[in-house]
């Protein structure tokens, strides 16, 4: 009992010391409550399509950039440029990659897709992310959709202008997943 008494006093002391454990509000987090579409639909829910597009743009950009760093030769402008065969393969692999790092979490009562390349501003101190399930397949299909819609050549040209240009190509424009018109339509629903 003697060993447990000092431990108990130490714990009680921490609660009494200003700035100790007792001054902090308890941290709580709950998993996002997913509706039927978010749980069972084969397609990416409309309110998450902008995040999905940005995730796809990030993965394409990152994979192309990694492939370029592996090149030993540069073009006349000093920039490393992939051959059509290589960038086509890299983009195909980007879509078939494992998307397990992505999932959904709720921040300020808004469900958002989260994962590499999607951070916006300060992260919440605690949150719960739902991963796996339909999300990897949905992201892979979204990636394949953009690959088919724009083609490898146009995507690689945008990549060469920078990550922002690639994201603007895939997600911007009047009908893009992140356009204000599409966002306004989502809010009306």
Curated annotation (Swiss-Prot):
Signal sequence, renumbered to the chain: 1-22
GO CC terms, sorted: cytoplasm; endoplasmic reticulum chaperone complex; endoplasmic reticulum lumen; extracellular region
For this chain, the annotated S-S bridges are 50-178, 53-171, 95-143
Q: Please describe the quaternary structure of this protein.
A: Part of the ER chaperone complex, a multi-protein complex in the endoplasmic reticulum containing a large number of molecular chaperones which associates with unassembled incompletely folded immunoglobulin heavy chains. Isoform 2 interacts with CASP2 and CASP9. Interacts with HSP90B1 and PDIA3 in a calcium-dependent manner.
Q: Which InterPro entries does this one have?
A: DUF3456, MZB1
Q: Name one GO biological process term.
A: regulation of cell population proliferation
Q: How is it modified after translation?
A: Forms an interchain disulfide bond with IgM monomers.
Per the UniProt entry, what species is this protein from, by scientific name?
Answer: Homo sapiens (Human)
Q: In which tissues is it expressed?
A: Widely expressed with highest levels in adult brain, small intestine and lymphoid tissues such as thymus and spleen. Expression is frequently lower in intestinal-type gastric cancer. In obese patients, more abundant in omental than in subcutaneous fat.
What is the name of this protein?
A: Marginal zone B- and B1-cell-specific protein
Q: Impact of altering residue 95 to S?
A: No significant activity
- Where in this protein would one find the motif Prevents secretion from ER, according to its record? 186-189
What PROSITE patterns does this protein map onto? Answer: ER_TARGET
Its biological purpose: Associates with immunoglobulin M (IgM) heavy and light chains and promotes IgM assembly and secretion. May exert its effect by acting as a molecular chaperone or as an oxidoreductase as it displays a low level of oxidoreductase activity. Isoform 2 may be involved in regulation of apoptosis. Helps to diversify peripheral B-cell functions by regulating Ca(2+) stores, antibody secretion and integrin activation.
Induction annotation:
Down-regulated in primary B-cells early after ligand-stimulated activation. Up-regulated in bacterial lipopolysaccharides (LPS)-stimulated peritoneal macrophages.
Q: What is the effect of changing residue 50 to S?
A: Does not affect activity
Q: Which residues form a coiled coil?
A: none
Which keywords does this chain's UniProt record carry? Apoptosis, Cytoplasm, Disulfide bond, Endoplasmic reticulum, Secreted, Signal
State the family it belongs to.
Belongs to the MZB1 family.
């Amino acid at each position: 009992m003697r060993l447990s008494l000092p431990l108990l006093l130490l714990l009680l002391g921490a609660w009494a010391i200003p700035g100790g454990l007792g001054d902090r509000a308890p941290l709580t987090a709950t998993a996002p409550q997913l509706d039927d579409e978010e749980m069972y639909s084969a397609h990416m829910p409309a309110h998450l399509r902008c995040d999905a597009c940005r995730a796809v743009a990030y993965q394409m950009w990152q994979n192309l950039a990694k492939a370029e760093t592996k090149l030993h030769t540069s073009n006349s402008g000093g920039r490393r440029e992939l051959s059509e065969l290589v960038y086509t393969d890299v983009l195909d692999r980007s879509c078939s990659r494992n998307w397990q790092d992505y999932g959904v979490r709720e921040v300020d009562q808004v469900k958002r897709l989260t994962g590499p390349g999607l951070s916006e501003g300060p992260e919440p101190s605690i949150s719960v992310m739902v991963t796996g399930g339909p999300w990897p397949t949905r992201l892979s299909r979204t990636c394949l959709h953009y690959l088919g819609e724009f083609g490898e050549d146009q995507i690689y040209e945008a990549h060469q202008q920078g990550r922002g240009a690639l994201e603007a190509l895939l997600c911007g424009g009047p009908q893009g997943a992140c356009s204000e018109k599409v966002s306004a339509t989502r809010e009306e629903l």
